[in-house]
């Protein structure tokens, strides 16, 4: 018969195996604009804005996600809606931890028997300190283990690319905070770059343009609506107009103006030019054989920013290679985590 020590060891082993079997395996796309979660065996279970509303008087959380996002620019003085992620990395550690913990509890991914294993995507070319901050924030929510993977690699996998072969695949992932550009072959990144220009900067470009040209102040949500529903950066129509409402900076009163498609192209031109320069620099660093693959296969765009009207034909014209948008650009990264889990 087993002695007491052996019996205890055996029981501990069974408990460990049970907990491991019960533990959920989770993929996070913790973006600047939105946070998406994929659970192995279940698929995408959460897609919410990366926003937390805090009562500044007592430091209590008022809302997280969709509810908090609706408060942006509309909160009373004591309530502040915060975006804790900036440029794809943590800008406010404490609020990020609160947000991750809230979402993990919302999807019931943690219980007294088990702690989840988490795969989190992060932009390429971020600093070791920034990587450690992302990992630590996830660990402090009760994760058993946390793994990091570079976003362009995961986006490519989520877009359906086979990156395992000795052939080049190129992806441009334009999210809320960063644009990640990478050429991949044999399951690794051959050359890459990451610029902190993406959807949120596009919004700020539109706000700045309208403020400077028309002395009209508009909010982030209005700017985002203009970007998504009206802006055009390739052969824009100067006759196509949109009414925009905001606050007149001279009188302080509500006011309405009209802007044209051509003006949106002008507002976004500098940021788009910087992205194209970064893409060109990556292509210039690519070995000739892999360059030939890209000419044949083209470039795949992922992320919400890839849906900017006119971006595909503009990139085709500037880069002289085929350019395509992934089938599900908004969810490529989190779907890629699902393949890797």
Residue ranges and their predicted role:
Residues 1-174, 182-300, 306-341:
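Nucleotide/phosphate-binding catalytic cleft detector across ATP-hydrolyzing
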């Amino acid at each position: 018969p087993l002695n007491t020590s052996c019996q205890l060891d055996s029981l501990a082993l069974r408990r460990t195996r049970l907990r491991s079997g019960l533990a959920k395996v989770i993929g996070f796309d913790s973006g600047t604009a939105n946070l998406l979660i994929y659970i192995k065996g279940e698929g995408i279970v959460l897609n919410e804005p990366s926003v937390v509303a805090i009562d500044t008087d007592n430091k209590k959380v008022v809302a997280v996600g969709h509810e908090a996002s609706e408060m942006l620019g509309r909160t009373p003085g004591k309530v502040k809606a915060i975006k804790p992620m900036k440029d794809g990395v943590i800008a406010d550690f404490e609020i990020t931890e609160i947000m991750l913990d809230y979402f993990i509890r919302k999807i019931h991914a943690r219980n007294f028997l088990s702690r989840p294993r988490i795969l989190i995507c992060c932009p390429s070319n971020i600093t070791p300190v920034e990587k450690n901050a992302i990992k630590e924030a996830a660990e402090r929510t009760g994760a058993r283990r946390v793994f990091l993977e570079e976003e362009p690699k995961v986006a490519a996998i989520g877009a359906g690319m086979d990156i395992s072969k000795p052939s080049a695949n190129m992806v441009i992932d334009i999210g809320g905070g960063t644009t990640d550009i990478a050429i991949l072959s044999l399951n690794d990144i051959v050359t890459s770059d990451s610029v902190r220009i993406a959807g949120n900067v596009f919004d700020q470009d539109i706000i700045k343009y309208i403020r400077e040209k028309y002395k009209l102040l508009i909010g982030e949500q209005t700017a985002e609506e203009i970007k998504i529903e009206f802006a055009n950066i390739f052969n824009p129509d100067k006759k196509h107009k949109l009414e925009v409402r905001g606050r007149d900076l001279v009188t302080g009163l509500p006011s309405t103006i009209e802007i044209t498609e051509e003006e949106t192209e002008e507002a976004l031109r500098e940021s788009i030019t910087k992205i194209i320069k970064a893409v060109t620099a990556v292509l210039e660093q690519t070995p000739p054989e892999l360059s030939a693959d890209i000419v044949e296969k083209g470039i795949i765009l992922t992320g919400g920013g890839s849906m900017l009207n006119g971006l595909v034909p503009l990139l085709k014209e500037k880069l002289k290679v085929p350019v395509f948008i992934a089938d599900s650009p908004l969810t490529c990264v989190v779907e890629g985590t699902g393949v890797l889990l």
